[in-house]
Amino acid sequence: MFGSRNFGIEDVEECFMKKGYKYTYIDDTSYRDRVNRQIDAKFADSIEKGIEGEKYDCVFTFNYSPVISNNCKKINIPYISFVYDNPQIQLYSYTVINSCNYIFIFDKAQYMELKNGGINTVFYAPLAVNIDRMNRMLGTNGSCNDRYKSDVSFVGSMYNEKHNLFQRLEGVSEYTKGYLDAIIQAQRQVYGLFFLEDLLKDRILDDMLKNYPVEVNTDGVESVEYIYANYFLARELATEERYDIMKKLGTEFGKDYLINLYTPNGSLKIDGVMNKGPIDYYNEMPYVFNNSRINLNITLRSIKSGIPLRACLLYTSPSPRDS
């Protein structure tokens, strides 16, 4: 199993152990690369060593890795990828057609797009939750720490941190700025259909490329329109939408109800809203859900139909404060 200590990997390990699966965990973020000689070497070394005198049956990663897929293809070993992120640009790598692949995607719309395109190595699978861990954590009282109590809560990035990609387009013309703002506002009114990518054409796209050029990978079919729409515009939309929702809640209900925001940008101030700063998704987030009367699920529009992990966790975390 290749990965990095991101949210959820511990749950996968617990699942493997419960099932009696033997595994080796290789912690290396470079497995996310499309090509990486360091990963090639680690892969070959691990496969050669085996595990407790036995050969490996398969290789597993969270999210899809072209470099892992190609290594699995070389030795004809199954590669299982459990995709929990969207956008996931690696899914447009030519390597997805490798016959060794078993790629499980949580966004059914993205799965259908690939499946209808003739990709037979993809499968639909909603995100999983470690219910046993949730039960252990929440116990009988679910932690009554005041840090986690609220009437309304939101956990997630506001996408207004210093690495906001949309701000790097500030050099475009006033016409392009107005156009981009208009299509972002239009997309805010529509759920279930993501059309920003289709609206980036001709002079608008040329202006964006001139001011902040992006390059597509040579080993894939993703377009510059896909990159701009999903990584620039969708996140700017999320910034505006999440801020406006929290601001409206704070203005209308902040005096009478406790409204908490848990986000990496701890300096953000919104009247009527308590910014609690960042929270650990593995060790703390379930307590927030369990101690909130209402938890908001404000989803990135690049997720077309998938149920986000926060919603999956909510299904397993009945609140003691429910009326």
Locate predicted features.
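Active-site proximal beta-strand in glycosyltransferases
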Residues: 72-87, 102-105, 124-127, 153
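Nucleotide-sugar donor-binding catalytic core of glycosyltransferases
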Residues: 1-12, 117-304, 321
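Conserved small/polar residues in nucleotide/adenosyl-binding loops
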Residues: 315-322
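Short alpha-helical segment that forms part of, or immediately flanks, the ligand-binding pocket
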Residues: 286, 309-313
